[in-house]
Amino acid sequence: MENIDICVEWEGPFSLEDIGYDENSNKYSISKELPLNDDKKDYGIYQVYGYHPVYGNNVLLYIGKADDQTFAKRLSQEGWAYNEDYKNIQIYVGRLFGREQKISGDEWSKQIGLAERMLIFAHAPAKNSSNILNITKDKTLLKEFENIRVFNYDAYRSLMPELSGELWVKGFNEYNGVYSTDNMIEKK
């Protein structure tokens, strides 16, 4: 099977106010003028950083995707304003790019989904726990990752710059256990 290279250019940070949150009304007002609401380009993957009661301040909380709606629309639906330290929430958005000038909508959406799942699998953000369990239990999904590489550029924050299914999935499938004296070959 052919390798699939997914390149992601990250931008941020953005605040909840940047995507239309109004603290006084406790509501979002999504308009075309907002950053991250351009219906031609504001699709891809996003990271949310903020406070977590166990892990502390300014940590990776969540990785999500926006492929059917813009980043601003998608993020406004997730309830980040209810985080007890919502004023310090930071959002980073990743847009896919590649060698091909044009890509089909289906392929774009597929690559967004693959990259999102691979990033969740490798980084295990606290608020993605149900997605992590679904991915690790589904051998078909894990097999799908084997030939994928994700390259992160620019403001990728605490994500690894490069991920590969070769490292995260294929290697573990070939793993035969920890070395011990029980399975040691005798010295000559």
Stretch-by-stretch model annotation:
Residues 1-61, 67-188:
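Boundary/linker segments flanking structured domains
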